[in-house]
Each structure stands twice: as C-alpha cells, then as structure tokens.
C-alpha cells in the first residue's frame, strides 16, 4: 500500500502509526498532479485506485497509466450521495466486503438523515452562507463547485460566480460586503481571528452578530479538504450548526460515531471539545 500524500503527525494519531510510514507517491489528478510512476512501479503495488470527481479525459489518462505500469488503474466516482456505493465498490475490489459495507451503510444512513431534514426546510428559508478560505479570507468556495458539495446541500451558498474553480475563487471585501451573508464559515488558517477585530469585517451582518465559525480540521477539513468521505462528517455537522432546532441528538455522539466507524478510533469528549472549539458560532461561545 502506498499513499497519494503522507500523513501529518496529528492525522497519524487517528489512523495509527502503521500508516504513518507508508510511502507517498503523489496524486494522479488535482492541483498537484505529482504522481510518481517510478515509485509506484518499484513499490510492488497491484492496483491503482483513484476516488473522487470524474473529469473529462480521466478514462484515457488512466488507460495510458495502466499500460505504463502494467497493473489495473481504476477510477471510482464519489460524491455525497454515492459514498456508500463507492465503498461497496472498494470492498469488492480489495476483498474486504464486510468492512466496506459497514462504512457504506453508515454513509448512506447519514446522507438520508440530512436529506430528509433538508426536505423540511424550504429553499427560501435556508441560511445564506459564505464559505471563505485563504489567509485573508478573500477566497470563496463557489456555489456548484465540487468543493462546495456540503455547503450547497445544507444552505443557500450565495457565492455565485461566473466560472467556479475546482477549489476556491478569489474575491474581495467589496464583493463579500455586497453578498452580506447571514452566516460565514472560515476554512482552517483563514481569517477567523481577523474577523473578530477588523473594522471591515465587522461591517458584515454575520460577523457583527457573531454568526460565524471555523471548520474543524482533524484529521481532515470536514467540508472539503480534501473533498472526500470527510464530507460525510461535515454534512452532519454543518446543518446542526445552522438549524439546531431540527436536531435533538448530541453533537459529540454524532461525531464520535463517525470517528469510530471510519477510523476505528474512540474519540474522547476532551478531544471532541478541542477539535470543535471554533466550530460553534461565536455568538454561542459567549
């Protein structure tokens, strides 16, 4: 087994040290595109599996890679609605159907729960949201982009731009003020701290009212970093922030169930509180 990217120390804490030393061979697709064919060939890998958004030309690229490496190269399409199918396919490919079905059933149940809740909230009553990233907070995760799957599903993502990019779109404070969202989500290492003190940010309805938070990021960003199965956790977290009246369960129990099912990790309440310290709207922290 080799990895597209190596694990950080904090990620290895959740996955286990046996995964920390696996070789990094880079990503086939995406912004990096740093796939190391020689390292894969030397590793003795028996199959290459790419999971994610299906893009034009991907099949041809994988066919060429398969010819070069002499081993099967497979792409499995995935999104919020199909993570269950994705894991079932992985289970069949790798001969671990029982474990894959456990995760698949969890993903399907989570998607159904949130879909059912969102059906009770008319589109016009959904919270106007901006999801901002970048050190200065001036990049937005645009409506209808692959990275915005969760935000689009559970809110009115008002970051409508002419040409949504794969990850984020550059914007400016004037545009953000014009959008004036009801709620702002900041990516990790973005402008969460700045927003609490900067005069320009304070002119926004969401910031003035304390209706903003930061996405948890352990072991991965819960919304889109990367846009993978961690989105299932974000899909359960974000609507509980935006529409708490629609849920009567305990957020810790919900998050702990995800960690147990996906990572086989027993998340303590202290760890949960640390991970989600900024995931609660500022107005509710006071």
Residues of each region from the PLM?
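A short, structured surface patch at a secondary-structure boundary
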Residues: 1-43, 47-56, 157-159
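Structural recognition of the beta-strand scaffold that forms the well-ordered cores
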Residues: 1-5, 47-51, 72-77, 127-133, ...
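Alpha-helical, coiled-coil/dimerization segments enriched in small aliphatic residues
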Residues: 29, 140-167
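Short acidic active-site motifs
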Residues: 35-36, 61, 171-175
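Short, structured coil segments at secondary-structure junctions
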Residues: 43, 68-69, 154-155, 207-208
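A contiguous binding-surface segment within folded domains or other stable secondary-structure elements
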Residues: 43, 161-214
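Extracytoplasmic substrate-binding proteins
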Residues: 60-139, 161, 168, 216-279, ...
């Amino acid at each position: 087994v080799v990895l597209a990217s190596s694990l950080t120390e904090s990620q290895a804490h959740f996955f286990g040290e046996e995964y920390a030393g696996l070789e990094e061979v880079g990503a086939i697709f995406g912004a990096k595109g740093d796939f190391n064919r020689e390292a894969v060939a030397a590793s003795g890998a028996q199959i290459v599996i790419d999971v994610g958004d299906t893009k034009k030309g991907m099949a041809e690229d994988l066919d060429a890679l398969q010819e070069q490496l002499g081993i099967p190269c497979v792409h499995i399409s995935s999104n919020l609605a199909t993570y269950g199918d994705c894991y079932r396919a992985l289970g069949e490919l790798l001969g671990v159907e029982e474990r894959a079905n456990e995760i698949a059933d969890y993903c399907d149940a989570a998607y159904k729960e949130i879909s059912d809740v969102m059906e009770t909230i008319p589109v016009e009553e959904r919270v106007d949201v901006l999801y901002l990233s970048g050190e200065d907070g001036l990049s937005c995760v645009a409506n209808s982009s692959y990275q915005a799957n969760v935000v689009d599903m559970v809110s009115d993502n008002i970051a409508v731009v002419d040409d949504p990019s794969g990850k984020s779109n550059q914007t400016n404070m004037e545009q953000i003020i014009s959008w004036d969202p009801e709620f702002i989500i900041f990516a990790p290492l973005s402008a969460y701290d700045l927003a609490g003190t900067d005069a320009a940010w304070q002119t926004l309805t969401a910031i003035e009212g304390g209706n903003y938070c930061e996405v948890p990021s352990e072991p991965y960003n819960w919304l889109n970093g990367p846009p993978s199965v961690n989105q299932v956790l974000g899909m359960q977290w974000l609507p509980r922030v935006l529409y708490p009246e629609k849920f009567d369960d305990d957020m810790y129990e919900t998050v702990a169930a995800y960690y147990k099912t996906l990572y086989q990790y027993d998340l303590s309440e202290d760890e949960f509180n640390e991970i989600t310290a900024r995931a609660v709207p500022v107005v509710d922290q006071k």
